[in-house]
C-alpha cells in the first residue's frame, strides 16, 4: 500500500487580492506535494479561502455587495490566480460551505458540553484587520494607543460577553507538544514559549456578539464563532471530518502517514498552540509536521503600499512565466529565514541556473551528438577516472536532493541539482569531446553520460517545473522522466537524439 501525505496551505483572507507571500507559501506546499508524489506517496493537497469575519463584512458593505456575493467573487479570483500560477490542488476550502459550518457548530457544542468552552466576559484589545484579540502586554503602546505587534494595526478596546476555550486545561500537554520535533523551526518554538507559554496562557475568546458575518452557534443565539475556531477546522472538514462520508479523513488524517501544514511565521501561534490544543480536546491525531517559513521582503525591507514596493505576482507571471517565478521562490529562498525578492535577483537566478548551466549543457551536448552521429548512443563501460566520477555524481544526485528535501530545505536541494549541471559542464571541459571523432569510442562514452546527467537534472527540476520538463522529456524521446530510470545508464541506447528547441532563453532586464 502507498504511503499517504496530506499537505495544507493556510486558507487566505479574501479582503484583498493574493500577493507574493501567498504564492510563496502555496508553492512550498505544492513542491512538497510534487516531491512526495515522485517518491510514491498518495497525496492530498488543499488550499482555500477564509471567508468569515468583520473585515469581510465591512469590505462587502464598502463595495455595496451582499457579503456572500463578495466572498464568492473573491474565491473565484483566488481559483483563477492558482490556474495562472499553474498550481493544482485537490481541494479548495471555503469556510462558508454549509458542511464546514455544520461541523464547526457541532464541535463548538461538543466542547461546551465537556466544559472546555465556557461563557464569560471579554475585556481587552481587538484588531479588526487581524481578527485577533490581544492583551495589553502583547500589544505595542504608543501615545496612549495600542497597536498590533506584527501588523501595526491600531487596536480597539472591547468589552462583551464571549465564550472562551479553556486553554489552561492543556498547559502541561502543550509544553510537551512544543518539545516534540513537529514544528520545523526551533527559533519559532523558543519564541512561542517565551512570548506565550512562559507568560501564562490566556484562555481564548472563541465567539463574538458584535460580529455580522460568521457561524452562529445556533439560530437563536447572538454569539458568532470567531475566526480561529472556524478557520482552523477546515483542515479536517476538507477531508469530510464529522460528515457522513469520512473516508478521506480516515485515509489521510486518522490513518495517514504524514499530515503537514505549511504556514507563515506570523500565524504560528494559532497553528502551533491553539490548533494542537483544539485537536487534543477532541482526541484527534496531531499534524506530523508544521513547516513555518519566513516572509518575503524586498531589498528596501518589508513590502508596503506606502513604500511603493509591493510586487504583483500576476505581473511577474505574465512577464516571466509561472515556472520561472516558482523556481526562484523555492530554489533561492530558504524557509528558515526571510527571503529577499527583486526582479534583478529573479532574472539573475534564471540566467545563471537555467540558461548558463542547464540550457548551455543541453545545447553543447546535443550539438556534438548531431554533428557526429545519426544513430542512438549506447552506454559503454569505461575505466577512466573522469567517467567513473561523473557516473557516481549522476547516480548520487537524487539521493543528495532527497537528503535536503526530507528536511524541507528545497533551496539546498535545487542548488545540488544545479551543482550537478556545473559538474557536467566541467566534465565537457575536461574530456574535450569536440576534439574527438565519431570513430573514437571515448566520444560516445562522454556524450552518453552527458545525456544521463541531463536526464537526472530534468527529473529533479520536474518537481518545480513540470511543464518545461515534460517538453524536454518529449524532445529526448521519453513520455516523462521517471525515478526508476535514473540509475539505468542504458536508457538512451535505443533513442536517436534529434534537434532540441531551446527551452530557456536569456532574459534581459
From Swiss-Prot:
Q: Which residues form the signal peptide?
A: none
Q: Which GO terms describe its molecular function?
A: ATP binding; methionine-tRNA ligase activity
Q: Which UniProt keywords apply?
A: Aminoacyl-tRNA synthetase, ATP-binding, Cytoplasm, Ligase, Nucleotide-binding, Protein biosynthesis
Tell me which residues bind ATP. Answer: 305
Q: What class of enzyme is it?
A: ligase
> What positions carry the motif 'HIGH' region?
12-22
General function of this protein: Is required not only for elongation of protein synthesis but also for the initiation of all mRNA translation through initiator tRNA(fMet) aminoacylation.
Q: Which GO terms describe its biological process?
A: methionyl-tRNA aminoacylation
**What is the name listed in the Swiss-Prot or TrEMBL entry for this protein?**
Methionine--tRNA ligase
Q: Which HAMAP family match?
A: Met_tRNA_synth_type2
Which cell locations does it reside in?
A: Cytoplasm
Can the keyword Aminoacyl-tRNA synthetase be found in this entry's annotation? yes
Chain ranges for the short sequence motif 'KMSKS' region as given in the UniProt record: 302-306
Quaternary assembly: Monomer.
EC number from the UniProt entry: 6.1.1.10
Q: Tell me the protein family, please.
A: Belongs to the class-I aminoacyl-tRNA synthetase family. MetG type 2B subfamily.
Q: List the record's Gene Ontology CC terms alphabetically.
A: cytoplasm
What this protein catalyses is: tRNA(Met) + L-methionine + ATP = L-methionyl-tRNA(Met) + AMP + diphosphate
Amino acid at each position: 500500500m502507498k504511503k499517504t501525505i496530506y499537505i495544507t496551505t493556510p486558507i487566505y483572507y479574501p479582503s484583498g487580492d493574493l500577493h507574493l507571500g501567498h504564492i510563496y507559501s502555496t508553492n512550498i506546499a505544492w513542491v512538497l506535494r510534487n516531491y512526495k508524489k515522485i517518491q510514491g506517496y498518495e497525496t492530498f493537497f488543499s488550499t482555500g479561502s477564509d471567508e468569515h469575519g468583520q473585515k469581510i463584512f465591512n469590505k462587502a458593505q464598502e463595495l455595496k455587495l451582499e457579503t456572500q456575493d463578495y466572498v464568492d467573487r473573491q474565491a473565484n479570483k483566488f481559483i483563477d490566480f492558482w490556474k495562472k500560477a499553474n498550481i493544482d490542488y485537490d481541494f479548495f476550502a471555503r469556510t462558508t460551505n454549509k458542511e464546514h459550518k455544520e461541523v464547526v457548530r457541532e464541535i463548538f457544542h461538543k466542547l461546551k458540553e465537556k466544559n472546555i468552552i465556557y461563557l464569560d466576559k471579554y475585556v481587552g484589545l481587538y484588531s479588526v484587520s487581524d481578527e485577533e484579540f490581544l492583551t495589553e502586554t502583547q500589544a505595542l503602546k504608543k501615545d496612549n494607543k495600542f497597536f498590533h505587534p506584527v501588523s501595526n494595526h491600531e487596536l480597539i478596546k472591547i468589552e462583551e460577553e464571549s465564550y472562551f476555550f479553556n486553554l489552561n486545561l492543556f498547559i502541561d500537554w502543550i509544553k510537551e507538544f512544543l518539545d516534540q520535533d513537529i514544528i520545523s523551526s526551533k527559533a519559532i518554538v523558543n519564541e512561542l514559549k517565551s512570548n506565550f507559554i512562559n507568560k501564562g496562557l490566556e484562555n481564548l475568546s472563541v465567539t463574538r456578539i458584535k460580529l455580522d458575518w460568521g457561524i452562529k452557534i445556533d439560530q437563536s443565539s447572538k454569539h458568532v464563532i470567531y475566526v480561529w475556531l472556524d478557520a482552523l477546522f477546515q483542515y479536517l472538514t476538507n477531508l469530510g471530518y464529522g460528515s457522513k462520508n469520512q473516508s478521506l479523513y480516515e485515509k489521510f488524517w486518522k490513518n495517514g502517514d504524514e499530515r503537514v501544514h505549511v504556514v507563515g511565521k506570523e500565524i504560528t501561534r494559532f497553528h502551533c498552540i491553539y490548533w494542537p490544543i483544539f485537536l487534543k480536546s477532541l482526541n484527534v491525531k496531531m499534524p506530523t509536521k508544521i513547516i513555518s517559513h519566513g516572509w518575503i521582503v524586498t531589498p528596501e525591507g518589508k513590502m508596503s503600499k506606502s513604500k511603493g514596493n509591493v510586487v504583483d505576482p500576476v505581473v511577474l507571471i505574465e512577464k516571466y512565466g509561472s515556472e520561472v517565478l516558482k523556481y526562484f521562490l523555492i530554489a533561492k529562498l530558504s524557509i528558515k529565514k526571510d527571503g529577499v525578492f527583486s526582479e534583478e535577483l529573479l532574472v539573475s537566478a534564471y540566467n545563471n541556473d537555467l540558461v548558463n548551466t542547464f540550457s548551455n549543457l543541453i545545447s553543447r551536448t546535443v550539438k556534438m551528438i548531431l554533428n557526429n552521429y545519426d544513430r542512438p548512443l549506447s552506454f559503454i563501460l569505461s575505466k577512466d577516472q573522469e567517467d567513473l566520477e561523473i557516473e557516481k555524481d549522476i547516480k548520487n544526485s537524487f539521493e543528495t536532493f532527497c537528503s535536503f528535501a526530507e528536511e524541507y530545505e528545497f533551496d539546498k536541494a535545487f542548488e545540488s541539482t544545479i551543482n550537478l549541471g556545473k559538474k557536467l559542464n566541467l566534465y565537457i571541459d575536461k574530456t574535450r569531446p569536440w576534439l574527438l571523432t565519431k570513430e573514437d569510442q571515448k566520444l560516445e562514452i562522454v556524450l552518453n553520460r552527458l545525456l544521463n546527467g541531463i536526464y537526472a537534472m530534468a527529473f529533479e527540476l520536474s518537481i518545480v517545473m513540470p511543464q518545461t520538463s515534460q517538453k524536454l522529456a518529449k524532445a529526448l524521446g521519453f513520455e516523462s522522466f521517471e525515478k526508476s530510470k535514473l540509475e539505468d545508464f542504458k536508457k538512451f541506447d535505443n533513442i536517436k537524439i534529434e534537434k532540441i528547441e531551446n527551452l530557456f532563453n536569456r532574459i534581459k532586464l
